[in-house]
């Protein structure tokens, strides 16, 4: 689960087929550790420097050739003899770098964890690229022509047995998906939010072979899973991807992290009309007198169920959302309207800021009506306040572009009275950032690209970093330390092992700490610590802007804080599917090269080198090579 914390494992009945759940669906607690099934895909990343200096990688588009054609020819040259398809999510970012994603195929089927991303500069030359294409032997197609593989229903049962999913399938039926090869939908299954799906694909195994698998998709609230079930046995699970990562508004204004930092105020028309052209209370076709609009729909969800449309939302015919709240109030349900408004405000403010930083419709952002700006619509964020499916946590589900994101904010029971996570902006921002990193890494159509332990850890780290950067105050210096989740958890130390700090005494974390660590949250703390160093190096050079939005000059933030955030966002779009620390670092360096011609190269290198990810650092799954060295010129 990509949530704020790692949830404990609660056992479910072992015989899921003998005891199906009742009609409808209930909240399912995870009965197995999904980390055991994480993908182990290895990608390569040729950064901008390597690409420019290697004649074998130099490739320039022909006159009048599109960037998609250029990228396609490049992949053909790099991977001769392999078959692949262009993923329909290519775009040109606001830094003028074009991003094109490819999926390898075999015998007419996708190899679901074999991807190639090509970044093309505005000069028509290849800027950088990432590659996780399968290089082994392609199986003979005879098993497909003879249909020598299991039925998708067998794969669904195998998923249920292996992952202990309590689904009711006694009334299930199956039908093929129109226009798709070996793709099916299960109707009449209880225990899921939406109908399960199965699609026949290949899966590249760590031993260098390809397995024919059924990719079984099951959304069971807390876990929205893609399970790769061996199509021969119908039982062996080769890997699992989880999409879930645990007017007038009276609110705590943007920049205040929680109730300890200030007071609520009335804010009038806070939206950015470029990012939210319909305002926050309209989707361009209809105006809503409630907490619903183009970017999100916020409501209470005490049952923890999925039928959000009919749930309670505060209503105001004159769009004046002013409701009482005090941190000393109890129970939390007594201030649910204030909670919903706060969550709606924070999520929309972040949407508008991210738009300025480059997370727009064409890059896969979350909007119901994309208004002809590219990408796929119908995917605002479902914002559940005081969600009854859990406590002391939060999570965000990120399906591919065109399907709504889903944020669940919980009540925290670590204090008396209990505290509502929606009033800690850092938690909301952390969760929303899962949606950003999943949509940008590998392209908007692929939400599987932060599925390895290290990539998933960086997913947690990006969330912590963005939340921390946003809460900076005018008087802060690089000596300022920040914790994560301290107010909600009622613990001044927060919910991470160390506070975010540039002091090696206060926070000694370095690249070597990732060795042997299988917790995405502790890995993420290492990554966010490095980004915190990066931010302060850039602030020392460019100054600090604590306004709600950056001042841009030629598409570049003029201050160090927002420049760091911009480079992080741009780096996500450049890096390969399932990156490691070294590749993500190189993507940030490339982002600066594209945005500023490398003006901040040394500041970036110094930040990473301080924490062991310097020049010469190398990724190895079991023993990472650390380095505090700087490249020449720094």
Swiss-Prot record:
Record-listed Zn(2+) binding positions: 430, 434
The record's Gene3D superfamilies line, in alphabetical order, gives: 3.10.170.10, Neutral Protease Domain 2
Q: Which residues form the active site?
A: 431
This protein's encoding gene: mep
Q: Which family does the UniProt entry place this protein in?
A: Belongs to the peptidase M36 family.
**Entry keyword Protease:** yes
Q: Which residues form the signal peptide?
A: 1-18
Q: Name the enzyme group at the top EC level.
A: hydrolase
What is the name attached to this protein's record? Extracellular metalloproteinase mep
InterPro entries of this UniProt entry?
A: FTP_domain (IPR011096), Fungal_virulence_M36 (IPR050371), Peptidase_M36 (IPR001842), Peptidase_M4/M1_CTD_sf (IPR027268)
């Amino acid at each position: 689960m990509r949530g704020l914390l790692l949830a404990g494992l609660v056992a479910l009945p072992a015989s899921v087929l003998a005891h199906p759940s009742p009609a409808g669906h209930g909240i399912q607690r995870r009965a197995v550790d999904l980390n055991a099934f994480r993908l182990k895909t290895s990608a390569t990343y040729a950064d901008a420097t390597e690409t420019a200096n290697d004649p074998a990688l130099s490739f320039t588009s022909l006159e009048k050739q599109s960037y998609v054609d250029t990228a396609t020819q490049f992949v053909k040259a790099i991977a001769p003899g392999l078959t692949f398809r262009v993923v329909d999510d290519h775009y040109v970012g606001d830094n003028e770098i074009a991003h094109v994603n490819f999926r390898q195929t075999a015998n007419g089927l996708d190899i679901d964890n074999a991807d190639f991303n090509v970044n093309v500069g505005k000069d028509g030359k290849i800027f950088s690229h990432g590659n996780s294409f399968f290089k082994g032997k392609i199986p003979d197609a005879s098993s497909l022509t003879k249909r020598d593989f299991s039925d998708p229903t067998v794969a669904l049962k195998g998923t249920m047995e292996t992952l202990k999913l309590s689904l009711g399938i006694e009334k299930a039926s199956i039908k093929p998906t129109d226009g798709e090869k070996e793709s099916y939908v299960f109707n009449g299954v209880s225990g899921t939010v939406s109908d399960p799906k199965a699609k026949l694909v290949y899966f590249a195994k760590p031993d260098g072979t390809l397995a024919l698998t059924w990719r079984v998709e099951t959304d069971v609230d807390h876990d929205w899973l893609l399970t790769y079930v061996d199509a021969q046995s119908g039982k062996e699970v080769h890997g699992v991807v989880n999409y879930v990562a645990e007017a007038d508004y009276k609110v705590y204004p943007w920049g205040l992290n929680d109730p300890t930092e200030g007071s609520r105020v009335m804010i009038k028309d806070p939206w950015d009309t470029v990012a939210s052209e319909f305002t926050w209370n309209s989707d361009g076709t209809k105006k809503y007198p409630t907490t619903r609009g183009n970017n999100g729909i916020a409501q209470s969800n005490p049952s923890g169920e999925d039928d959000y449309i009919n749930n309670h939302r505060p209503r105001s015919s004159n769009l004046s959302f002013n409701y009482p709240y005090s941190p000393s109030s109890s129970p939390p349900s007594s201030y649910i309207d204030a909670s919903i408004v706060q969550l709606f405000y924070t999520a929309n403010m972040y949407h508008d800021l991210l738009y300025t930083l480059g997370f727009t419709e064409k890059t896969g952002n979350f909007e119901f009506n994309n208004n002809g700006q590219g990408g796929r619509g119908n995917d605002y964020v479902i914002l559940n306040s005081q969600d009854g499916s859990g406590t002391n946590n939060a999570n965000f589900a990120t399906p591919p572009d065109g399907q709504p994101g889903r944020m669940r904010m919980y009540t925290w029971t670590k204090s008396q009275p209990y505290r509502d996570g929606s009033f800690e902006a850092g938690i909301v921002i952390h969760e929303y950032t899962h949606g950003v990193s999943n949509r940008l890494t590998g392209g908007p159509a692929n939400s599987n690209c932060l599925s390895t332990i290290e990539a998933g850890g960086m997913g947690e780290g990006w969330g912590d970093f963005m939340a921390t950067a946003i809460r900076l105050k005018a008087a802060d210096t690089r000596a300022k330390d920040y914790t994560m989740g301290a107010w909600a958890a009622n613990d001044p130390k927060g919910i991470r092992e160390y506070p975010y700090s540039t002091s090696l005494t206060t926070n000694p974390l370095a690249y070597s700490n990732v060795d042997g660590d299988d917790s995405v949250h502790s890995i993420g703390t290492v990554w966010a610590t490095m980004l915190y160093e990066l931010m302060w190096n850039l602030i020392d050079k460019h100054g600090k802007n604590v306004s709600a939005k950056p001042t841009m000059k030629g598409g570049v933030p003029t201050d160090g804080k927002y420049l760091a955030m911009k480079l992080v966002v741009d780096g996500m779009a450049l890096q390969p599917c399932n990156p490691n620390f070294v590749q993500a670092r190189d993507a940030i360096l490339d982002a600066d090269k594209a945005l500023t011609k490398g003006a901040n190269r040394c500041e970036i290198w110094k930040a990473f080198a301080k924490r062991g990810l310097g020049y010469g650092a190398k990724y190895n799954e079991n023993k990472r090579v650390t380095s505090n060295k700087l490249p020449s010129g720094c």
